[in-house]
Amino acid sequence: MDDVIKKGLSIVSELRDHGFEAYIVGGAVRDYHIGRKPKDVDVVTSASPEEIRTLYPHAFQINRQFQTLTVHLQKVAIEVSTLRGGSIEDDLCSRDFTINAMALAMNGDIIDPTGGKTDLENGVIRSFHPEARFKEDPLRMLRAPRFASELGFTVAKGTAEAIKGSCSLLADVAVERVEKELTQLMIGTHRSSGWCLLHETGLYPFIPGVSLSKETVLRMKEISRSPGLLPADGFWAILYLLENCSMKLPLAKEKKKRIRTIVHYVGERQNHSWNETMLYQASLSVATVVEQIRALFGQASVHEEELRQLWSSLPIQTRTELAVTGRDVMAHFQKKGGPWLADTLADIEEAVLLKHIENEKKSIIQWLEERRVES
């Protein structure tokens, strides 16, 4: 049995020892059935949030609406929620899809009121009373193509029809909740199926924070047929590049910066080949993604091994590898810091990178002295 499941069951056991019902539910049970390692584990219990906190004083509440607390057990974060409805069956019937609506009891029994195990075996994404489920939380509609991409399953006809009839509700979902689902869709093994489903259900115009045209969705569907696996930021960069697609998602600052960098160097590669300076400024990881994007668009691309060889030949790969620091430069010139220092360090960096001087403190100081004499 997987270690994550074991840790979840230890929480279940402890809750039961204190007189509460408790079960492992959701994606962990699904993954357990298909032989996939669960990324995390959720537990539901008849205990109230206050009672959960009494048992686990260090637990913190992350979702007041669903009365969910996170309990850390040996570096594994376990979400513990109070049962919705009067029973475990009521709780499971209110979940997004049948494949996520199974519970694992302490004795190993599977509670499956909606036929999730059968749907799992048949590779079907189906919602129990889909109109009601999507009205409760419209984001669930976006999770259908996400799971189609991740698992390679097909969506049941009734569920797909319910998405078509309810898709406008998605526009009211907070944009902060959209990023995770779209990211998982983009990096799934069967991502082309996810984009296909966005198109077929008519869901794509209603995704908050992303203005997707039909042409963009169909282009992403075709691009995603490639067997090569592009990292998520590469797919986000492609969305930025494609016409008629604008982004208003509140992505993390560093993620936005990296995506913009990838987009910039995709543009640079239209007119320039990689050289030492350009590769150094971009970084090997960005350059690799840029070449993967070029390949997806049918453009001539540089093989990753060639990029690695050029990268390995660089005298330095980051400024922190310089043999001198800003403190060394200030001490040598006996001057306080200021704009001159940043300019001087940039000059040193360029000279070392272009192999005009050795990356050795004595050589750099001598070079600085020669420049001072010349000026």
Swiss-Prot record:
<dbReference type="InterPro" id="IPR032810">
    <property type="entry name" value="CCA-adding_enz_C"/>
</dbReference>
<feature type="binding site">
    <location>
        <position position="40"/>
    </location>
    <ligand>
        <name>Mg(2+)</name>
    </ligand>
</feature>
<dbReference type="GO" id="GO:0008033">
    <property type="term" value="P:tRNA processing"/>
</dbReference>
<feature type="binding site">
    <location>
        <begin position="137"/>
        <end position="146"/>
    </location>
    <ligand>
        <name>CTP</name>
    </ligand>
</feature>
<dbReference type="GO" id="GO:0052927">
    <property type="term" value="F:CC tRNA cytidylyltransferase activity"/>
</dbReference>
<comment type="function">
    <text>tRNA nucleotidyltransferase involved in the synthesis of the tRNA CCA terminus. Adds the two cytidine residues to tRNA.</text>
</comment>
<keyword id="KW-0808">Transferase</keyword>
<keyword id="KW-0460">Magnesium</keyword>
<dbReference type="GO" id="GO:0046872">
    <property type="term" value="F:metal ion binding"/>
</dbReference>
<dbReference type="Pfam" id="PF12627">
    <property type="entry name" value="PolyA_pol_RNAbd"/>
</dbReference>
<keyword id="KW-0820">tRNA-binding</keyword>
<comment type="similarity">
    <text>Belongs to the tRNA nucleotidyltransferase/poly(A) polymerase family.</text>
</comment>
<dbReference type="InterPro" id="IPR050264">
    <property type="entry name" value="Bact_CCA-adding_enz_type3_sf"/>
</dbReference>
<dbReference type="InterPro" id="IPR002646">
    <property type="entry name" value="PolA_pol_head_dom"/>
</dbReference>
<feature type="binding site">
    <location>
        <position position="177"/>
    </location>
    <ligand>
        <name>CTP</name>
    </ligand>
</feature>
<dbReference type="Pfam" id="PF01743">
    <property type="entry name" value="PolyA_pol"/>
</dbReference>
<feature type="binding site">
    <location>
        <position position="100"/>
    </location>
    <ligand>
        <name>CTP</name>
    </ligand>
</feature>
<keyword id="KW-0479">Metal-binding</keyword>
<keyword id="KW-0694">RNA-binding</keyword>
<feature type="binding site">
    <location>
        <position position="42"/>
    </location>
    <ligand>
        <name>Mg(2+)</name>
    </ligand>
</feature>
<dbReference type="InterPro" id="IPR043519">
    <property type="entry name" value="NT_sf"/>
</dbReference>
<protein>
    <recommendedName>
        <fullName>CC-adding tRNA nucleotidyltransferase</fullName>
        <ecNumber>2.7.7.-</ecNumber>
    </recommendedName>
</protein>
<feature type="binding site">
    <location>
        <begin position="95"/>
        <end position="96"/>
    </location>
    <ligand>
        <name>CTP</name>
    </ligand>
</feature>
<keyword id="KW-0819">tRNA processing</keyword>
<dbReference type="InterPro" id="IPR032828">
    <property type="entry name" value="PolyA_RNA-bd"/>
</dbReference>
<dbReference type="GO" id="GO:0000049">
    <property type="term" value="F:tRNA binding"/>
</dbReference>
<keyword id="KW-0547">Nucleotide-binding</keyword>
<dbReference type="Pfam" id="PF13735">
    <property type="entry name" value="tRNA_NucTran2_2"/>
</dbReference>
<keyword id="KW-0548">Nucleotidyltransferase</keyword>
<dbReference type="GO" id="GO:0000166">
    <property type="term" value="F:nucleotide binding"/>
</dbReference>
<feature type="binding site">
    <location>
        <begin position="27"/>
        <end position="30"/>
    </location>
    <ligand>
        <name>CTP</name>
    </ligand>
</feature>
